[in-house]
Amino acid sequence: MSTNPPDLRPDLAPKARLTQPDRPGQPTIGMVSLGCPKALVDSERILTRLRAEGYGISPDYDGADAVIVNTCGFLDSAKAESLSAIGEALNENGRVIVTGCLGAEPEYITGAHPKVLAVTGPQQYEQVLDAVHAAVPPSPDPFVDLLPATAVSLTPRHFSYLKISEGCNHKCKFCIIPDMRGRLASRPAHAVMREAEKLVDNGVRELLVISQDTSAFGVDIKHAEERGHRAHITDLARDLGSLGAWVRLHYVYPYPHVRQLIPLMADGLVLPYLDIPFQHAHPDVLRRMARPAAAAKTLDEIAAWRAICPDLTLRSTFIVGYPGETEEEFQTLLDWLDEAQLDRVGCFQYENVAGARSNALPDHVPEDVKQDRWNRFMAKSQDISEAKLAAKVAQRLEVIVDEVDADAATCRTKADAPEIDGNLFIDDGHDGLKPGDIVTVEVDEAGEYDLWGRLAPSA
């Protein structure tokens, strides 16, 4: 019943992976998980705790004694999706506990759905468990349920998100994450490594490192070193790379020390992939966002990174139609894209978020203008993507297999994160492949966002 990615319907989402089947009479809980990968990790933690306490995990509404809805509250559209999911869970099951980012506004939820059993905010794991205990008392089997359990996973067996911190110290005017999740709170590096080691030992082939600001990891704890591991993103990346799995870094801000990561990518210790939220390119727009405004220096930094690691893939997200954005400022963004030649981009039309300081800015952009700019931005980025992928035809690339069916094997290259980037499809000679395999392919064809290829002959 969990959603991964967030645009999947709950009834189409993958089932949680469990270590043992439910037993007769065991109380069961369902989970609907909305929002970003960081919220998905929260859902996994909750389910793991419940599983260890003796609860079964139901993949459908009918089999659950109660349902937890882990909400997203970042944008108005996300709030609407969360309210819809809560309503569906109430209609299908009737016993619903709400948690997550939208839970920071309990009156907003109970005003729309007064019959929910409880509302808790983000990261309030104990309160969620208390609400479950009150609604569905646990009934553990002391010989099975309370043994140390492998964590419940809502992703396929071969990749896993690894959350290294909570919260954020940035004060971007369009964002309310610090209000919902607080300031940066890094995990001890040794705790992150212990989790990563367990994941790899259990068959995970790819670790996706996530947080609100991955490059700030350890700043709040003064980069403390404990048990042989230092809380700094460069040290952590090096340590993770030693485990032998693919390591992919998400949500990295372009601080100067990020350049220390690039040699690790050039040496193959971590994947040559950076997910960096640039958001815009015009300095005046960036200042109105309360973000770093050195777009020209960013281009120089990108060039320096690529000089060290030519295979580096850069992904980013942008906002168009931000309050006050002029046509000239938007054109600067398009020109910057031409120069930066980013491999993967996402783009959002600005919308007000309750509590965000950007709401009060003057000169909001009309909806039709935002839509037009979004269309032009996506056309530009599509052209760049298509040209970059065309250059990969006839190359040999290493890929990880995500799914296999009768028609094709769906894979990803090192340049593709799950759910948000493209795929490489093998539609012939894929019968012996299975999810999690890492194989070499020859690229035969390229599209706008995806590749097609065949297994490369063994040397």
UniProtKB/Swiss-Prot annotation:
HAMAP family: MTTase_RimO. Keywords: 4Fe-4S, Cytoplasm, Iron, Iron-sulfur, Metal-binding, S-adenosyl-L-methionine, Transferase. It catalyses: L-aspartate(89)-[ribosomal protein uS12]-hydrogen + (sulfur carrier)-SH + AH2 + 2 S-adenosyl-L-methionine = 3-methylsulfanyl-L-aspartate(89)-[ribosomal protein uS12]-hydrogen + (sulfur carrier)-H + 5'-deoxyadenosine + L-methionine + A + S-adenosyl-L-homocysteine + 2 H(+). Belongs to the methylthiotransferase family. RimO subfamily. SUPFAM superfamilies: Radical SAM enzymes. It comes from Roseobacter denitrificans (strain ATCC 33942 / OCh 114) (Erythrobacter sp. (strain OCh 114)). Residues 27-137 form the MTTase N-terminal domain. Residues 154-387 form the Radical SAM core domain. GO terms for cellular component: cytosol. One of its GO terms (molecular function) is protein methylthiotransferase activity. GO terms for biological process: tRNA modification. It is found in: Cytoplasm. Residues 390-457 form the TRAM domain. Binds 2 [4Fe-4S] clusters. One cluster is coordinated with 3 cysteines and an exchangeable S-adenosyl-L-methionine. Its EC number is 2.8.4.4. Its main location: cytoplasm. It comes from the Bacteria. Its cofactor is [4Fe-4S] cluster. Catalyzes the methylthiolation of an aspartic acid residue of ribosomal protein uS12. [4Fe-4S] cluster 2 binds at C168, C172, C175. This is Ribosomal protein uS12 methylthiotransferase RimO. [4Fe-4S] cluster 1 binds at C36, C72, C101. Residues 1-28 are annotated as: Disordered. InterPro entries: Elp3/MiaA/NifB-like_rSAM (IPR006638), Methylthiotransferase (IPR005839), Methylthiotransferase_N (IPR013848), Methylthiotransferase_N_sf (IPR038135), NA-bd_OB-fold (IPR012340), Ribosomal_uS12_MeSTrfase_RimO (IPR005840), rSAM (IPR007197), rSAM_horseshoe (IPR023404).
